[in-house]
């Protein structure tokens, strides 16, 4: 199943227009969790 990523972290196969779960090694739940983790970290670090 092809997925489109919207984050910018190469560890999750991101910053490419298309990817598959087999090439990224991440499920959609993993991507959602990593996005939320990055979002919370960014919110905590803003001035």
Swiss-Prot record:
Entry annotated with the keyword GTP-binding: no
Amino acid composition bias (Low complexity), ranges on this chain: 16-28
An individual GO BP term: bacterial-type flagellum organization
Compositional bias per record (Polar residues), positions renumbered to this chain: 1-15
Keyword check for Cell inner membrane: no
Start and end residues of each stretch annotated as Disordered: 1-30
Listed InterPro entries: FlgD (IPR005648)
Alphabetically ordered keywords of this record: Bacterial flagellum biogenesis
Top-rank taxon, per record: Bacteria
Protein family (similarity comment): Belongs to the FlgD family.
Function: Required for flagellar hook formation. May act as a scaffolding protein.
The protein, known as: Basal-body rod modification protein FlgD
Organism field: Yersinia enterocolitica
